Amino acid sequence: MFDDILSRWNAVFSSVTVDDDPAEALATFIRAKVEMSRLYPLASRLFAMEIMQGAPFLMTHLRTNMREWVRGRAAVMQQWIDQGRMAPVDPVQLIFLIWSSTQHYADFQVQVLMVENKAEYEEIIVETQAQIAEV
């Protein structure tokens, strides 16, 4: 179950190469992650609970597949940075930031709705995706 969740979350960014446009690639990844939060909020919450419990079922995956995936994506971003095509940031920390900010919409749905004074979750996701596309 968790492998499927993680594969879906990261699929869009898995095929990104140094030849891709960094802004487009990152925006596409963010939009996809926000959409996953909208479509599969329970998956995000289950993953968060697994991590908060010390990752008893995911430890091996995190140490192997996930670590390798993050390092591969970070290497692509580092090349973009080295080429002057992306602002100098720590690529691994950027991945963590994208994961956390996009999954926030699923994990803290009640908070987002109350703060935004919205009755429907989907309104917020649609607005967020539109804003990301403009960046």
Regions found by a protein language model. Give the residues of each.
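Active-site micro-motifs of SAM-dependent methyltransferase domains
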Residues: R8, Q53, S100, H104
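Helix-loop segments that flank and shape redox-cofactor active sites
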Residues: V18-D20, Q53-G54
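C-terminal peripheral helix-coil segments that are non-catalytic and often amphipathic
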Residues: E35, L39, R67, R71-R85, ...
